[in-house]
Amino acid sequence: MSTGQEEHLDSKLENQISEEENQSQNQNFPTAIEDSIQASIEKLDEVDDEINPIEVKDEFPTTIGTTYDILHPREPFPKRIKLEETETEPDSNGIADNDQTMVVVPPKKPQLFYTPLKTGLVYDVRMRYHAKVFTSYSEYIDPHPEDPRRIYRIYKKLVEAGIVLDPSLAGINEIGPFMLKIPIREATSEEILQVHSEDHLKFIQSTEDMSRDQLLKETETGDSIYVNNDSYLSAKLSCGGTIEACKAVIEGRVKNSLAIVRPPGHHAEPNTPAGFCLFSNVAVAAKNMLKNYPESVRRIVIVDWDIHHGNGTQKAFYNDPRVLYISLHRFENGKFYPGTKYGDLNQVGEGPGEGFTINIPWRSSGMHDGDYVYAFNKIIQPVISEFDPDLIIVSSGFDAADGDVIGACHVTPAGYGYMTHTLKGIARGKLAVILEGGYNLDSISKSALAVAKVLVGEPPENTITLRPQAEAIEVVDEVIKIQSKYFKSLRNGIPNGIFEDVYDLADVEKSNYKLVNIADPIRSHQVEKLFNEKEFINIPIISSPSNGEKPPFTTDLPDQLEDLIVASPDIYNCTTIILTIHDPPEIWANINPTNGVIETNSTMVLEHPLVQIMDKIQKEKDPENQEKFGYLDINIPSFQLPIPGTTSESSTYNPIIFAQEVLLYIWDNYIAYFQQLKNLVMVGFGDSYQSIVNLYGKRPSNEIKDLIKGTVAFLNRTTLKPLIPVMDESMVDWYYQNSIIFTSNFNTCWTGGSGAGNGNGNGNGNNGNSSNGGGNKSADSNGHDDFSKRPRKKFGRVIKAKTDGLCDVIQEKFDEGVDFILDSIEDYSSSED
């Protein structure tokens, strides 16, 4: 294309655009330009065929896009198109500096209700006035765990982190860009009486005028509380501050809130202060929200992650379907404070409130981030989402934090941050975090800071990668089985009928179902193989003596007695007997993930360990050893089927007690009469092994030492049983020297999970820290002074396997166990020679 042609086309384009622009309105500006440019380009098609079409394509693209494409064409472009001679060039942001700036979307106010708001903070130094009356200098230097400095240290930590701006730590009102100070007030009597009785309120009120002696008496006789003349004021401020923290969230003045208050509240019951708590702060606040905001607050969730069960909060809403109470706490079968069964997993509410209480009771100390996160992911998050609350209140005790000797657990600041972050994603972020317990000043301040950061908008500090402990998985599974009755979100992988309800199918009046305990045919298969291949025989049990003697069994017997005990055909004439006692075998199977049904075609049972022992001994025993070997096998059923069609207790059968009694029965009625017997080796598998240790403490030590040459046990997480001799203290050394106990690497004797320390929670708080759990300094139930050491001699010679699970422990340590059996027998034989 020639230069003259280009100039001619440019001139025509400019004239065309100028004419059409003058005739159009401002609002049709983009459309007019595009129409005119398109018309001009169509005229280009009529140009002489001598013009190179490729050059035209390069210089004048035939695809016309947006107005911006026209005003800012790709290079090379011979000349920029101007709409008017006086038009200014757009700036770097594409905005022209004149009155004709194009507006496509007018500026709008951000459609955000949450992000622009601050996090609310409740704090008042007057709550520090509640303090224990000192009676000695030692109480001053070793203060009560519920220390007034708790709230000060948390507030100070927030200031040190820059989240709160208060250099003088005076509790000022203007605290910076991240948090908004919520004015605190005293709770009114009317508000407190929504939860507590009038007598309860009058008692706390009376402490204002009590004498020193009266205050000391109430402190001494109360259930882990102390009082002074300022306790009533502090308690009203703590309760009122909790109400205001929730109120500010509901009214939209803050996006969420953190109430640094004391005294705590979740142990205070309607009629009784307890566990350092005077008024049930969270319960009073929840009642207040439901009453005063009936349109916006219909359902509330209370998540209590204090290490102690919130018995007071649970009682306040036990029959109220509007409040879902969830508690994670150290329980220890009701032995940990508050020391009742009220926090067990089967406590689910009553009346209209049934199904609106969820307890997740840890069996021991030592729980960590992985355990709490697992419970949140499997139970708490799906259940709260299904409940769909209008407000979430957290009873935030930090006594499960790492470093707190009372809780003796290991939740880190990152763990608390993760839990807070999870709850922020529900109920449109309407979350109020209220301080409860926590008695290590460093731990409580660091944990509260992590929560505050997440409330303000920071993500959790770290990703939680720690795996849950087996104990936590088991507890969570038990809770899911119970709560799946009430929450659909927990039913994935759970059978449509609760396991206990399956027995109703066997009611002959209602159906033709006949139930079979799978353990019975498995045992029948085991003994059939022993009968056919090893020619074993049944050993009978006579449960009812004919001569009027006391029955040998205090529990009901299993149904299938004929296969319970089997032995070698010539057991009476054997000089060496290996006795095995075991639980029913483990079953490996694929489980349908939608309904929990076991897929039978993929179900496997490992070969009976006794058969493996017999084969290996036959191969490896000394050929010169002419001892006649015999074998005796005892199977201990795990439980007894209920009587079909009845609601009564079907059986008093207890597998642990039965195992102990049946082994004593075999010793007294069979082994004692084997005249040829010289060597006896005991081999235990699983929980049944405890019966062997029980035998050693119940029968004369000289008989035990003379006959038994060794003890071998294969355990998963079975609690170790100590040998407690009645008379002969040397039995402990004998047991240690002649035993080998293989355990899972997660057995509590190594992890300290079964009661590391004898802390009893809030305990009897009158004696300071010592009464609230000595924590990790005392020995655990498996005899440790330090978890890095081996268990004491009274537990036998304990060896830790590298694996977890009974089958894996057997597979790993089987050869070593059989070698120990052979060494025990052959060493004795050689010593006789």
From Swiss-Prot:
InterPro entries: Arb2-like_domain, HDAC_PDAC, His_deacetylse, His_deacetylse_dom, His_deacetylse_dom_sf, Hist_deAcase_II_yeast, Ureohydrolase_dom_sf. Signal peptide: none annotated. Residues 5-52 form a coiled coil. GO terms for molecular function: chromatin binding; histone deacetylase activity; histone H3K14 deacetylase activity, hydrolytic mechanism; identical protein binding. GO terms for cellular component: euchromatin; HDA1 complex; heterochromatin island; histone deacetylase complex; mating-type region heterochromatin; nucleolus; pericentric heterochromatin; rDNA heterochromatin. It catalyses: N(6)-acetyl-L-lysyl-[histone] + H2O = L-lysyl-[histone] + acetate. It is an enzyme of class 3 (hydrolase). GO terms for biological process: cellular response to alkaline pH; cellular response to starvation; epigenetic regulation of gene expression; filamentous growth; filamentous growth of a population of unicellular organisms in response to biotic stimulus; filamentous growth of a population of unicellular organisms in response to pH; filamentous growth of a population of unicellular organisms in response to starvation; negative regulation of transcription by RNA polymerase II. Its main location: nucleus. Residues 1-40, 760-791 are annotated as: Disordered. It is found in: Nucleus. Residues 760-776 have a biased composition (Gly residues). Residues 1-13 have a biased composition (Basic and acidic residues). Its EC number is 3.5.1.98. Belongs to the histone deacetylase family. HD type 2 subfamily. This is Histone deacetylase HDA1. It comes from Candida albicans (strain SC5314 / ATCC MYA-2876). The gene is HDA1.
